[in-house]
Amino acid sequence: MASYLDFEKNIQQIDEDIINAQIKGDTEAVSILKKNLEKEISKTYKNLSDFQRLQLARHPDRPYALDYIELILNDAHEIHGDRAFRDDPAIVCFMGYLGEKKIIVIGEQKGRGTKDKIARNFGMPHPEGYRKALRVARLAEKFQIPILFLIDTPGAYPGIGAEERGQSEAIARNLYELSDLKIPTIAIVIGEGGSGGALAIGVADKLVMMKNSVFSVISPEGCAAILWNDPAKSEAATKAMKVTADDLKSQGLIDDVIDEPTNGAHRNKEAAAVAIADYVKKSLNELENIDVRELSANRMQKILKLGAYQEA
């Protein structure tokens, strides 16, 4: 059953009316309702607020990494384990073909359904997850296979066990190692880009975001709790933090924004997957014509520009 956000209630009502009309066999009513649905979808998604985009980034029906992997990869084979502690299901790694091009995809997976969410720790990787990602990235470099990173996490797991096993070291190590990989890399924020948990697989030649994704150093709820001692002010925090794809593009923090279907990726996963696949193919064609040493140098320059400021 489809899930609906508060601002999608009109869409939900029309969807239900369509189902009822189909059950009754009223084809004329179905045709009229579908036209009304298209108008309502266009109206609803035309001028979304920052907070509504945050809600869409977290939408329970939004496609996750495994959904995109299934839709865009052919002959996909999963790679498990960090070869040191265990396999972290919050990070998924696959080798396969994007069209005729061999590629490795490394993504953060939140999970669907209670059991899967718990197994994948709600998309919050442990240090062994980031070490698995790094192991696979090194494997990709060894065999000269480009990497696609799919970012979707509320953040790295902050539990005691994760800290004891070196969470901060694992993230820092990934930042260091991924910045110098001698292969083309692309990172796409497909949902939530939560702080260091996102950065740990977000160092790439191209860092891009889906239109209805977000990227921030802390959740708006956390920001509101710290600044105003009131998590309920998360809507104001979302606007103040500039977390949307358009905001980050205007600040030069990301390279591109991938448009989603008019009704959002959660209502048309296939179209969203096509948009990602097309962007990745085009970008890899560009990046593969650049010397790998130049790619590495350019990547480092991008990192050094982050956080620059001018004194008034």
Swiss-Prot record:
Organism of this sequence: Campylobacter jejuni (strain RM1221)
NCBIfam families (alphabetical): accA, AccA_sub, PRK05724.1
Record's subcellular location: Cytoplasm
CoA carboxyltransferase C-terminal domain mapped to chain residues: 36-286
Record's function text: Component of the acetyl coenzyme A carboxylase (ACC) complex. First, biotin carboxylase catalyzes the carboxylation of biotin on its carrier protein (BCCP) and then the CO(2) group is transferred by the carboxyltransferase to acetyl-CoA to form malonyl-CoA.
Description of how the protein assembles with itself and partners: Acetyl-CoA carboxylase is a heterohexamer composed of biotin carboxyl carrier protein (AccB), biotin carboxylase (AccC) and two subunits each of ACCase subunit alpha (AccA) and ACCase subunit beta (AccD).
Main location: cytoplasm
Pfam families, alphabetized: ACCA
GO cellular component, one term: acetyl-CoA carboxylase complex
PROSITE patterns, per the entry: COA_CT_CTER
Gene Ontology biological process terms in this record: fatty acid biosynthetic process; malonyl-CoA biosynthetic process
Broad enzyme group: transferase
Pathway: Lipid metabolism; malonyl-CoA biosynthesis; malonyl-CoA from acetyl-CoA: step 1/1
Record-listed E.C. numbers: 2.1.3.15
Keyword Ligase attached: no
Keyword vocabulary terms for this entry: ATP-binding, Cytoplasm, Fatty acid biosynthesis, Fatty acid metabolism, Lipid biosynthesis, Lipid metabolism, Nucleotide-binding, Transferase
Sequence similarity: Belongs to the AccA family.
InterPro entries to which the protein is assigned, alphabetical: Acetyl_CoA_COase_a_su, ClpP/crotonase-like_dom_sf, COA_CT_C
Name the record gives this protein: Acetyl-coenzyme A carboxylase carboxyl transferase subunit alpha
SUPFAM superfamilies per UniProt: ClpP/crotonase
GO MF annotation list: acetyl-CoA carboxylase activity; ATP binding; carboxyl- or carbamoyltransferase activity
Catalysed reactions listed for this entry: N(6)-carboxybiotinyl-L-lysyl-[protein] + acetyl-CoA = N(6)-biotinyl-L-lysyl-[protein] + malonyl-CoA
